[in-house]
Amino acid sequence: MTLDTVTPRTNLLGLTREEMESFFVSLGEKKFRAAQVMKWIHHEGCADFASMTNLSKALRTRLEELAEIRGPRVVYEGTSQDGTRKWVLEVEDGSYVETVLIPAEGGKRRTLCVSSQVGCSLDCSFCSTGKQGFQRNLTSAEIIGQVWVASNSFGARRDTTNRPVTNVVMMGMGEPLLNYDNVVPAMKLMLDDNGYGLSKRRVTLSTSGVVPKLDQLGDELDVSLAVSLHAANDELRNELVPLNRKYNIATLLDACRRYLAKCDDTRMLTIEYTLIKDVNDQQHHAEELAALLADLPSKINLIPFNPFPHSGYEKPSRNQVMRFQQWLYDLGYTALVRTTRGDDIDAACGQLVGRVKDRTKRHERYIQSIQLDAD
């Protein structure tokens, strides 16, 4: 047998229930084996077929020959003073991504911020990840692997009363809807009772506005939706979020209305609005935002800008952030200020740069500009 004829083992970590059932049927096994193995992987954190004691020895041996459970490798783990935890993970081809676990409510709520791509192609002007350029999409195994790593770090069996990860937000590195074919299977695993058993309200996808894929998502899953808006007029949003030149605000919000109409329960849209000093933090910006959302059931998350080298932007003062929030309250809107978490370990929103091995021209120019300024 030559190396060319060796069949790679199937990584079971990223398989949905349907895919896992098909895999076992292809081996001549019953479909129920899929649920057994999924529970070992996602409930028990098991990566060793020999430990799966409710499978026959013959099946375990066969699985060792034909399959594997391969998650990302932890390169770095850090814990912030506020309890936020960040992992730098090595995925296939030696690329690095980051995932962040944010505790709240006395530790009862743990929200995992998950990456969908190595780097990001959107180049939003206020986001440090975008300045690193784009390398590739993550596979479904690499996406769900972030949940697997975070859950395993607690070393406890997972069930409905003991979930190390209670919420997932697809708000890490990358634009999830530009990696649709891998993000959707990963989210299905988050929702599956044989996976992580999260409710649709506890899984949130954040998008900058890839409208065709947003319409497609509404036909497949009705997870919670967040939109990275950051401006209430096209002129400013074109500057902050270049994708707006392709799908403008009106087109995006119409897609959001269609999405909410497909949800099987009453759901609100989350609007993400990064506050940047003297750019979008004045009273007329708040009034413009309120008018824009007048007929859309929504809540607003205000995110004070997190500075990074050569961004050209500044963080507004705390007083200005509070004023902006009050203006929205006075206009009848629920507006929450997202507390900066994990900034002492570069885990705060917008700081997910990581040690991404990216060779794009934009990344090279960014590095060169830093070096020139340092000279």
Swiss-Prot record:
Q: How is the cofactor bound?
A: Binds 1 [4Fe-4S] cluster. The cluster is coordinated with 3 cysteines and an exchangeable S-adenosyl-L-methionine.
Gene Ontology terms, MF aspect = 4 iron, 4 sulfur cluster binding; metal ion binding; rRNA (adenine(2503)-C2-)-methyltransferase activity; rRNA binding; tRNA (adenine(37)-C2)-methyltransferase activity; tRNA binding
Residues binding S-adenosyl-L-methionine, per UniProt = G174, E175, S206, S228, L229, H230, N306
In short, the EC number is: 2.1.1.192
Q: What is this protein called?
A: Dual-specificity RNA methyltransferase RlmN
Q: Which UniProt keywords apply?
A: 4Fe-4S, Cytoplasm, Disulfide bond, Iron, Iron-sulfur, Metal-binding, Methyltransferase, rRNA processing, S-adenosyl-L-methionine, Transferase, tRNA processing
Coiled-coil region(s) at which residues?
Answer: none
Q: Which domain of life is it from?
A: Bacteria
- Family of the protein in this entry: Belongs to the radical SAM superfamily. RlmN family.
Q: Which GO terms describe its cellular component?
A: cytoplasm
- Identify which residues the record assigns to the active site: E98, C349
Localisation:
Cytoplasm
From the record, give the cysteines joined by S-S bonds.
C113-C349
What remark does the entry add? Reaction proceeds by a ping-pong mechanism involving intermediate methylation of a conserved cysteine residue.
Q: Which HAMAP family match?
A: RNA_methyltr_RlmN
The GO annotation for biological process reads: rRNA base methylation; tRNA methylation
UniProt cofactor(s): [4Fe-4S] cluster
CDD domains (alphabetical): Radical_SAM
Q: Name one Pfam family in it.
A: Radical_SAM
Q: Which reaction does it catalyse?
A: adenosine(2503) in 23S rRNA + 2 reduced [2Fe-2S]-[ferredoxin] + 2 S-adenosyl-L-methionine = 2-methyladenosine(2503) in 23S rRNA + 5'-deoxyadenosine + L-methionine + 2 oxidized [2Fe-2S]-[ferredoxin] + S-adenosyl-L-homocysteine; adenosine(37) in tRNA + 2 reduced [2Fe-2S]-[ferredoxin] + 2 S-adenosyl-L-methionine = 2-methyladenosine(37) in tRNA + 5'-deoxyadenosine + L-methionine + 2 oxidized [2Fe-2S]-[ferredoxin] + S-adenosyl-L-homocysteine
> How far does the signal peptide extend, from start to end residue?
none
Which species is listed as the source?
Chromohalobacter salexigens (strain ATCC BAA-138 / DSM 3043 / CIP 106854 / NCIMB 13768 / 1H11)
What lineage is on file?
A: Bacteria, Pseudomonadati, Pseudomonadota, Gammaproteobacteria, Oceanospirillales
| EC class name | transferase
Residues forming the Radical SAM core domain are 106-346
Briefly, what is this protein's role?
Specifically methylates position 2 of adenine 2503 in 23S rRNA and position 2 of adenine 37 in tRNAs. m2A2503 modification seems to play a crucial role in the proofreading step occurring at the peptidyl transferase center and thus would serve to optimize ribosomal fidelity.
Summarize where [4Fe-4S] cluster binds, as residue positions. C120, C124, C127
